[in-house]
UniProtKB/Swiss-Prot annotation:
GO biological process, one term: guanine catabolic process
Keyword Hydrolase in record: yes
Protein name: Probable guanine deaminase
Residues holding substrate: H81, A82, P83, Q84, R212, F213, H239, I240, S241, E242, D329
């Protein structure tokens, strides 16, 4: 989607390519068409000339970083609820299950409306990008059209994302509950079909199978979700062991299963592409099972504390060989910033160290940075593509600026070394310190370029045309009052639904119910 762009970056580079390894070095990095094609740990004139002589970089734009700037991998949010963003900062008065009923379900159900959803999703994508999130694993609502809209917005803004339409047909309010397992699965199939047109290679946006959590799904829905993920080779995301009351509910609903994790395993929902949020109260047998299945965990320390759910022992998970990343868990977590989640992960590990009387439980700076980047990349099954810097990986990167001229809230002194300045950035900075945010070799945010739809790189005509048509079809099907549209677009419309009344009532007899009123937005916001 970028064309053949090429850039060379010269300056300080910081990353954590493996757990416990923090590398701070001078570097020259060459990027062609979104990927790193040249990386030397030097920024001498000779190295720059070598980069410029690379056959793919002969016409590269040179970016020389300032003395207090450095390159850092893009941050990865492994668990965030996009529709809950308007509730950020509220709802600390009740625990998890009551919180869902009082705050979350009413808000999410209101986002069946495309215009309301558009306003929310544009702002959450803008905000997360401005905070350095280059990859987000999003829960959407149970509505297919607005989930498709979220995918369009992420694609247009240039944020890598997993987009999950929630599957939930049990123990949910009447106004926010799917009628059956089959209707839930069919709606998910529609989203998969739409996103396969929007991004066939799944380079930027990918559908993710999203059973909300075990209690919200009947057994046939859980089984169907597992089958869909297997059939389409898709990632899976859900919640596990966030709250002790939730765990007791799972035991009541699935008495034949050994544990919460065993419920997911039985329905083929524990795979190397599975992201399990929270995992605070796992039993040892469950940890062994997750290790065996190579499933990943999203550590969400902010919401774990705000909702009084508990303290997750990340050290124990890491020592067991489980991949762990960080999640903001908006809006259980109040901030759409992975750096804030990182800070809370640090505090959680220190609090738990005191409670357990074990200093080894504490996470150090390099480990925390790993969770926010390469660890998160492993959790979303993209560890070979993003999360650190290496030839062949995508250029998903931040240019961090610690200079006072950026209105920085980080105070730097002459005696500060790079490890000191890095720690200050982690614990005292905000979005004012992000000069540039790059995804796939494309500048998408940062104070030097605020992301918006008008200046984003246009989609190719083929994707825009086809994707927009299918988006209309989803909109039509789901705006029919209590009526289901045809499973596939009528062939007389060239494979797509259209808005011409004559087509629907004459050529497509039987495709739509005779008494149906089909609504099509004239301007869906897609470009």
């Amino acid at each position: 989607m970028d064309g053949h762009t090429c850039d060379v970056f010269v300056g300080k580079l910081i990353h954590t390519p493996s757990l416990g390894e923090l590398e701070i070095t001078d570097a020259t990095v060459g990027v062609y068409n979104g990927k790193i094609v040249f990386l030397e740990k030097s920024m001498t004139p000779k190295t720059l000339e070598e980069a410029k002589s690379h056959h793919l970089l002969k016409e590269a734009t040179i970016h020389k970083l300032k003395p207090l700037q450095f390159m850092f991998p893009g941050l990865i949010d492994t668990h965030i609820h996009a529709p809950q963003y308007p509730n950020s900062g509220i709802g600390i008065d009740v625990p998890l299950l009551q919180w869902l009923e009082k705050y979350t379900f009413p808000l999410e159900s209101s986002l069946a409306d495309l215009e309301e959803a558009r306003q929310v999703y544009k702002r959450v994508v803008e905000r997360t990008l401005s905070n350095g999130t280059t990859f987000a694993s999003y829960f959407s609502t149970l509505h297919t059209p607005t989930s498709a809209l979220l995918a369009e917005i992420c694609y247009s803004y240039g944020q890598r994302a997993y987009i999950g339409k929630c599957n939930m047909n049990n123990l949910s309010p009447d106004h926010y509950c799917e009628k059956s397992a089959e209707s839930s699965l069919e709606a998910t199939r529609q989203l998969i079909s739409y996103m396969s047109i929007l991004d066939p290679k799944r380079e930027m946006v990918t559908p993710i199978i999203t059973p909300r959590f075990a209690p919200s799904c009947t057994e046939d829905l859980l089984s169907g979700c597992g089958e869909l993920a297997e059939k389409h080779n898709l990632p899976i995301q859900t919640h596990i062991s966030e709250n002790t009351s939730e765990i007791e509910l799972v035991k009541e609903l699935f008495p034949e299963r050994k544990s919460y994790a065993d419920v997911y395993d039985y329905y083929k929902l524990l795979t190397p592409q599975t992201i399990l949020a929270h995992a605070i109260h796992l039993e040892d047998e469950e940890i062994e099972l997750l290790t065996k299945r190579s499933s990943g965990i999203s550590h969400c320390p902010t919401s774990n504390s705000i909702l009084a759910s508990g303290l997750a022992n990340v050290r124990k998970l890491l020592d067991s060989g489980i991949n762990v990343g960080l999640g903001t868990d908006v809006s259980g977590g109040y901030a759409p910033s992975i750096l804030i989640a990182l800070r809370h992960a640090a505090m959680t590990s220190r609090s738990l160290s005191y409670v357990l009387g074990d200093p080894k439980v504490m996470l150090d700076l390099s480990e925390l940075l790993y969770l926010a980047t390469q660890g998160g990349a492993e959790v979303v099954s993209r560890g070979d593509q993003v999360g650190s810097f290496a030839v062949g990986k995508y250029w998903d990167a931040l240019i961090v600026d610690l200079s006072a001229e950026t209105h920085s809230c980080v105070d730097i002194f002459e005696r500060d070394t790079w490890p000191v300045m890095l720690s200050k950035w982690v614990f005292t900075s905000d979005d004012r310190n992000l000069a540039q945010v790059w995804v796939n070799g494309r500048l998408v945010s940062g104070f030097e370029m605020k992301a918006n739809l008008k200046n984003s790189t246009p989609l190719t005509n083929g994707v825009t045309s086809s994707g927009h048509q299918v988006f209309k079809e989803l909109t039509q099907a789901h705006l029919l009052p209590r009526t289901q549209c045809v499973d596939t677009p009528p062939s007389c419309c060239g494979g797509h639904c259209c808005k011409e009344e004559s087509c629907r009532t004459e050529n497509c007899k039987g495709a739509y119910p005779a008494n149906a009123t089909v609504t099509v937005e004239e301007d869906s916001g897609m470009s």
